Every structure is written in C-alpha cells, then in structure tokens.
C-alpha cells in the first residue's frame, strides 16, 4: 500500500467484544422491579439462599460456647432478625444495591479465639458459660464496628477506593467468589447422595431446561433454586423416613437427615429478639483489637462483593463516595450484630450476589422483600426452624454455582484491561497466586497444629495477623492494589493498560448521570447528605 499504511480491516474480520459499563441481558435492574407475585417468590429464594450461612455459623459456635439446641435456635433467630434489619438499611441508606447483609465467616476465627481464651474456664454451668462468652463477643463486635463506621462515614475509605482500577478489582472480586471453594464441593461430599443430585438438578433446571422448554417467561432459570431445593429436599426426607440413615455414623446423620428435631423442637413459636438479650456486654481490649482486624478484613471483602453486586444488578461502577457510604452502614450492621448478640459480625452475602446472576434479576425491591421474610421467619421461630433444617449439602450445592458466578463477575473486569501487557499479566498472576497460596499455608498450618503460624503469648496479636492472611480476597486484593499503584504508574500508556480510563467518569457521583438513578438516597435525603 502506498505510504506504508496498514490495510483497512475487512468487513468480515473478527473483532473483539466491546467492553460494557453495564452488564447487558439483565431482566430487571435495580430500579425496575418485577411484578409483585414474581418479586415475592424471588425474595423468598434470596431468603432460602442466605439460610445456609445463618445456620452453619451457630452450628459451629454455639456448642463450643456451651449452648444447647435452645440457645442455637435463639442465635439463628437473632441472626435472621438482624440480617433483615441490616439488609433494609443497606438497600435504603447504604449503597442502595440489592445486597443482602448477613452473618460473615470472617468473624468466626476471632469468636473461636474468644471461646478458647482461659478466662471462661472457671464457669462450670454450660449455659452461664455460653452467656458469658456471648457477652464478650458482643463487646468485641461493638468496638470493632467503629472502624468501618469511621472509615466509611468520614470518607477515608472513599479516598482509598479511588485508586481501585479494573486490574486490581479482578483478583479482589474474583477471589471473593472463588476463595470460598472450601464451602462448595467439600460440603456437597458430606452427603453425596443428596448434595450431588442437588448440584446436577440445579445446573440442568437453570441452564438446560429453559432451552428445552421455551416458555418465554424465564420460569426455570429464574426459580431454579426453589425447583431444585424442593425436589431434593423431598428425596432426602424419603431417605430419612425410610431408615436409610438409622445405622449411619453421627456425622453422616447430621449432614443427611431432614428431621433435625433438636432445632425445630427447641425453637419457640413466637419470639422477638431484643438488644442485650444475653446480658450486658463485657469488654476486653485484646479481643476488641482482634475483632477490629476481622472487621477490616470483612470491609475489604465486602468492597469486592459490592462491586460484584453492582455488576449483576446491571448498574454502573459504584462511585467511591457511595462505596464508602455503604461501608459506613455495614459498620452500623456490625454494631447491631453486637447489640443483639449474633456471635459474628455482618458483611455482604456472597451467595446472594451469585443468585442475582442466576436469576438475572437485580431489583432492589426483591432483596427488600427477602429482608421482610428474614424478619418474619425470625419471629415465627418454628416455621423458620423448618427451613433451617434443610440439609447442609443441599446448601453447599447452591454455593458451587453462586460463588462461581461471583468469581466470574470479577474476571469480567478483564474486558477493560490490556491483556497483552506483561505488567498486567504479572499483577494478575502474582496476586491471584499469592491470594490462593498464602491462605492455604495459614489454614493448613492451623489444621495440623491447632493454632496459626503466628503463635505468641498474646492471643489477640496472633488473631490480628493470622485472620487477614487466611482470607483469599484480602491477600489477593491487597497485593494487586499495591502493585497496580506502585509499578510504573506514571507511564502514560500504563493508565490504559490498567483500564483506569474506563472508570474515570465514576470517580465522582456527578461524573455520570446514571449514578443518580442507581445510588441517590430516598426521601430527598441527597439534599441533606450530598454524595461527592
């Protein structure tokens, strides 16, 4: 060609898929609710999905505290009640995303550390011991909540996340989902004859059946969780009443049986949880510092979860001020958890973020309806306990799909990055590898020795180091964030490689008109609490 120019591309030459600020093909976004009957069913699905964590955390903690079935049932009710309140607060005044805020596994190691501390060994009565430990956990959570409230409401976290780019969001959001792999198939395998059918039916109903039976109403993919859970729950109940587990080992019976008479029998018919129901909180400086570090880890993880939720709700990237506001209200959620005595702090539910992807419904109203179900079934204890008795392998099968969706949501931000850049490859590969490898070392060491790699005489200091390095998204996100903001950042071509130019318009609340549509406060509160 004359002049040495490159030939014009042919019309049929393959072109890359164009990057999208908002995820296309979503049926209902934040501000477009589905019809009421459909919204109520979808809200009930969200309630079913968040039950897994709600039951697993008290199951792990309450027996170690000294509590029995009655205390466990009360803690489950309390977690449900608090989750309903916190979800409403987050959807109304926080980020306003359809994010469920429930109990978090991140706080469990610190709570276990409080349980194992020697200061409760002099209490012989197990119920008294349970209440003393719960009051100590309450005190630690109340103090720890101040960290997120200060960072969020002061705008300090806003200044941090302004440096977040698509390349550093990939490891953070990706491992928020993929980092929870231990709760997936290992949980399914605890009762493979129930867990595996649930996983297969869920995939078939949600992915294959809509293409076989084209109803045009998205019934199967939208309500796949209800279909799959009901079918396998009935099947599991038939196995239970048929005597399939009568001679099985106790662990098998716990995982497989549907007649958990203990939790259903112990749950009261009607009970409204109230603040300080276990007594006045007690405070210990070391435990408060350890819980504060767990709160900071939950803050980082929830930042990634909020980004994933915004993607699957077909919203634009959150402006830093909105993300900071959401973190502030998550601090309020931890405070409420401490006041009511849930045994663990609160963070964004990753499994419910994955459910948004499965249903393709990112409506705020649906999640608010789910919050109503949480509060309703927490007060009517017997009915809530029936749903809480769903075998854990069924819930673990749901996790296999939902955590995968959230991880894939993190990978989707690669569309904004230059994948032909060696800088990009190094940051992505190194951060993801360390995000998997470092927590593996810490968790493996703890499983073998019974304590973490950092093992000094100060238990609170051990927790402050061991907890963050046991979190995959915290390690991966921190490494990626540091490298992305220190490695040849001033080079002009690097900015495009990072994908930062795609998010420039979302640096401030008024930088894009869509931000007001998705994230503005209700009741004209933006006039009094303006976002920047």
Curated annotation (Swiss-Prot):
The keyword Transcription regulation does not apply. GO terms for cellular component: endoplasmic reticulum; membrane; plant-type cell wall; plasmodesma; vacuole. InterPro entries: NCS2. Expressed in the apical region of cotyledons 4 days after imbibition (DAI). Expressed in the whole vasculature at 12 DAI. Expressed in the root central cylinder and lateral root primordia. Expressed in the vasculature of sepals, filaments, carpels and developing siliques. Residues 1-24 are annotated as: Disordered. One of its GO terms (molecular function) is transmembrane transporter activity. Belongs to the nucleobase:cation symporter-2 (NCS2) (TC 2.A.40) family. This is Nucleobase-ascorbate transporter 6.
């Amino acid at each position: 060609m004359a002049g040495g120019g490159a030939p014009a591309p042919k019309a049929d030459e393959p072109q890359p898929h164009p990057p999208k600020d908002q995820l296309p093909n979503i049926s209902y976004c934040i501000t477009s609710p589905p019809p009421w009957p459909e919204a109520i069913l979808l809200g009930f699905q969200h309630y079913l999905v968040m039950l897994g964590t709600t039951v697993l955390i008290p199951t792990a903690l309450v027996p170690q505290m000294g509590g029995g079935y009655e205390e466990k049932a009360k803690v489950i009710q309390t977690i449900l009640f608090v989750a309903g309140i916190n979800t409403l607060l987050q959807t109304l005044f926080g980020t306003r995303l359809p994010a469920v805020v429930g109990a978090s596994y991140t706080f469990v190691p610190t709570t276990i550390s409080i349980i194992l501390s020697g200061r409760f060994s002099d209490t012989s009565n197990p119920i008294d011991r349970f209440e003393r430990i719960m009051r100590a956990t309450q005190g630690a959570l109340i103090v720890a909540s101040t960290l997120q409230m200060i960072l969020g409401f002061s705008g300090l976290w806003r200044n941090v996340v302004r440096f977040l780019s698509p390349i550093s969001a990939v490891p953070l959001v990706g491992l928020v989902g993929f980092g929870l792999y231990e709760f997936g198939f290992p949980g399914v395998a605890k009762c493979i004859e129930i867990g595996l059918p649930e996983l297969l039916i869920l995939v078939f109903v949600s992915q294959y059946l809509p293409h076989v039976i084209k109803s045009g109403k998205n019934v199967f993919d939208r309500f796949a969780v209800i279909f799959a859970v009901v079918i396998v729950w009935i099947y599991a109940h038939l196995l239970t009443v048929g005597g399939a587990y009568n001679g099985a080992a106790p662990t098998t019976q716990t995982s497989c049986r549907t007649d958990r008479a203990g939790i259903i029998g112990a749950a009261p018919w009607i009970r409204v949880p109230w603040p300080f129901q276990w007594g006045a909180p007690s405070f210990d400086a070391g435990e408060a510092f350890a819980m504060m570090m767990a709160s900071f880890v939950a803050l980082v993880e929830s930042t990634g979860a909020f980004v994933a939720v915004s993607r699957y709700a077909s919203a634009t990237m959150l402006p830093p001020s909105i993300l900071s506001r959401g973190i502030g209200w998550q601090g309020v959620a931890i405070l409420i958890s401490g006041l009511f005595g849930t045994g663990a702090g609160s963070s964004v539910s990753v499994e419910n973020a994955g459910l948004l992807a499965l249903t393709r419904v990112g409506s705020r109203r649906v999640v608010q309806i789910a919050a109503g179900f949480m509060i309703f079934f927490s007060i009517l204890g017997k009915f809530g306990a029936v749903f809480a008795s769903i075998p854990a392998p069924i819930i673990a099968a749901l996790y296999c799909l939902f955590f995968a969706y959230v991880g894939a949501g993190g990978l989707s931000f690669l569309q904004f990055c230059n994948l032909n850049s060696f800088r990009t490859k190094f940051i992505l590969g190194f951060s993801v590898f360390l995000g998997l490898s470092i927590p593996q070392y810490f968790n493996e060491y703890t499983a073998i020795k019974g304590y973490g790699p950092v093992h000094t005489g100060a238990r609170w200091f051990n927790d402050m180091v061991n907890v963050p390095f046991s979190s995959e998204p915290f390690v991966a996100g921190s490494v990626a964030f540091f490298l992305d903001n220190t490695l040849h950042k001033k080079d002009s071509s690097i900015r495009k490689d990072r994908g930062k130019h795609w998010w420039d318009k979302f640096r401030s609340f008024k930088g894009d008109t869509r931000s007001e549509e998705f994230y503005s406060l209700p009741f004209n509160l933006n006039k009094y609490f303006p976002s920047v």
